[in-house]
Amino acid sequence: MGQVFLLMPVLLVSCFLSQGAAIENQRLFNIAVSRVQHLHLLAQKMFNDFDGTLLPDERRQLNKIFLLDFCNSDSIVSPVDKHETQKSSVLKLLHISFRLIESWEYPSQTLIISNSLLVGNANQISEKLSDLKVGINLLIMGSQDGLLSLDDNDSQQLPRYGNYYQNPGGDGNVRRNYELLACFKKDMHKVETYLTVAKCRKSLEANCTL
């Protein structure tokens, strides 16, 4: 009986520590989701502002080209639909989110420099991407979702954005900016979805459907 009473304080401390870790984890998820929501809204605004400067025929042509083209980050294997997203583990969603954010660290700077419409958003983009990457890394390290078996895709360096690091001038520059903005918006939407699902899973909510 005495041993039981001795164990009770230990169990209580362990319980409080576990609750504290869960609260901190949820706090980090809240911050990460808030940051990526801001980035997604910013990406939408940037794309809409740029799209508004185009002529109707120019807009239609660029949209057709983009639908046939692909984003640099498409080489990162990620869920193809809502069903696959919901089947993915928390840790897998965090790893994919980390890779997607990482893939935009340099291209976003190039885009800002090349387009005068985006200069005012420069600090917001670079700071938010950097903060979000650090936050997701903390969530990965603190995740108790099990070990993730990373395939070769996760260790590969992303291909460069073709000629996007150069300044083609004229129509080439317009197409490059359109594609980068469209891809940035697309990827921020992906990360927002993945982090929202992961956060819901960690909060033990009954319904995490998209």
From Swiss-Prot:
GO terms for biological process: animal organ development; calcium ion homeostasis; growth hormone receptor signaling pathway; hyperosmotic salinity response; magnesium ion homeostasis; positive regulation of growth; positive regulation of phagocytosis; positive regulation of receptor signaling pathway via JAK-STAT. It is found in: Secreted. Zn(2+) binds at residues 38, 192. GO terms for cellular component: extracellular space. Residues 1-22 form the signal peptide. The keyword Hydrolase does not apply. InterPro entries: 4_helix_cytokine-like_core, Somatotropin, Somatotropin/Prolactin, Somatotropin_CS. Disulfide bonds join 71-183, 200-208. Keywords: Disulfide bond, Hormone, Metal-binding, Secreted, Signal, Zinc. It comes from the Eukaryota. GO terms for molecular function: growth hormone activity; growth hormone receptor binding; metal ion binding. The keyword Ribonucleoprotein does not apply. Its main location: secreted. Belongs to the somatotropin/prolactin family. Growth hormone plays an important role in growth control and is involved in the regulation of several anabolic processes. Implicated as an osmoregulatory substance important for seawater adaptation. This is Somatotropin. The gene is gh.
